[in-house]
């Protein structure tokens, strides 16, 4: 996150590079007379006044940052993951309270630093978000008036065919259990249900919801090397629209995804993110209606309740909302790895 400087104290990575001009200031110049030994004997005039560097205050909370690091390391050790990232946002202000990447390195000891450890994965790496994209498909359909939270879909037998491709839910669905509401589609994370919802939408409508939610564009964090992700413009083939509805064929960075989810806690408003402390929180832009945001937020609370995909995320005494997502890792030459995953 902080990055480092070179021997001349010029920022090379991270915050040090992104805010170099503010931190370093600018050198000045003056006209002088020197004696034959190079000593200044008379100051003639100032040509350019110097500007001292300024301090900046990061929005990071040291306690949250440490706990995020500790929990990420524990989760990676438990699940034997090769890499991971956590970002914590204040949804009311857009401030980044914690941003953690592993593996990492000690900037005070550069002997162990390499490209794999040095890059800020939260901002510079993209991944297919998988089922974490389903709430945005539902939000788009709610906004368009195509569905209501209690609209029912039949997802039995747990498969749906689009052209020559068959899309499956994680588990087979019996005829008796096949009729589910939109709320249950999100709660159970049904691919089939989400695809059926997406088929009610024009591609342009779905794209506009995703684009307005910040996907396919920079978050504006100012961090060097931040990627925009990938969001294809319509028109889409039916199979692309189907797979995008549950988070395949679209790529995001972790900060983009976290920022987009603040829509549901901020009654449909999207605010810019900031790595620096801000005095006056921005008003934000209304992306979806308050009614839609509250409806989806309720569905996300069902995800972490009994019957959802993440009941262990419940915290006694607190309202918790969330969404799980799992995708196969994309191969370098195309296609997907069979036994390598990205989990959100």
Functional labels for PLM-detected ranges:
Residues 25-30, 84-85, 238:
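Extracytoplasmic/periplasmic mature domains of Sec-exported, cell-envelope-associated bacterial proteins
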Residues 41-84:
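Conserved, well-ordered alpha-helix/loop/beta-strand core segments that scaffold catalytic motifs
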């Amino acid at each position: 996150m902080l990055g480092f400087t070179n021997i001349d104290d010029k920022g090379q990575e991270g915050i040090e590079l992104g805010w170099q001009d503010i931190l370093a200031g600018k050198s000045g110049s003056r006209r002088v007379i020197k004696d034959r030994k190079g000593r200044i004997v008379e100051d003639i005039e100032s040509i350019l006044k110097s500007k001292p560097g300024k301090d900046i205050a990061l929005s990071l909370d040291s306690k949250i940052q440490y706990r995020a690091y500790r929990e990420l390391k524990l989760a990676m050790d438990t699940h034997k993951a090769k890499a991971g990232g956590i970002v914590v946002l204040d949804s009311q202000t857009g401030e980044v309270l914690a941003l953690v990447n592993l593996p990492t390195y000690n900037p005070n000891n550069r002997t162990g630093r390499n490209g794999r450890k040095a890059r800020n994965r939260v901002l510079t790496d993209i991944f297919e978000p998988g089922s974490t994209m389903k709430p945005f498909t539902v939000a788009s359909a709610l906004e368009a008036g195509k569905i209501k939270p209690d609209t029912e879909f039949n997802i039995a037998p747990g498969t749906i065919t689009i052209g020559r491709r068959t899309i499956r839910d994680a588990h087979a669905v019996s005829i008796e259990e096949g009729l589910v509401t939109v709320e249950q589609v999100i709660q159970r994370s049904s691919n089939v249900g989400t695809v059926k919802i997406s088929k009610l939408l024009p591609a342009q409508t779905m794209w506009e919801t995703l684009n307005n939610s910040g996907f396919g564009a920079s978050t504006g964090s100012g961090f060097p090397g931040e990627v925009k992700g990938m969001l294809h413009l319509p028109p889409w083939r039916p199979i692309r629209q189907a797979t995008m509805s549950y988070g395949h064929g679209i790529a995001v960075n972790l900060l983009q995804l976290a920022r987009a989810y603040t829509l549901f806690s901020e009654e449909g408003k999207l605010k810019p993110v900031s790595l620096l402390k801000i005095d006056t929180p921005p008003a934000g832009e209304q992306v979806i209606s308050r009614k839609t945001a509250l409806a989806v937020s309720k569905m996300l609370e069902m995800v972490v309740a009994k019957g959802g995909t993440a009941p262990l995320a419940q915290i006694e005494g607190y309202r918790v909302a969330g969404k799980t997502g799992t995708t196969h890792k994309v191969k370098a030459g195309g296609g997907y790895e069979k036994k390598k995953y990205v989990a959100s």
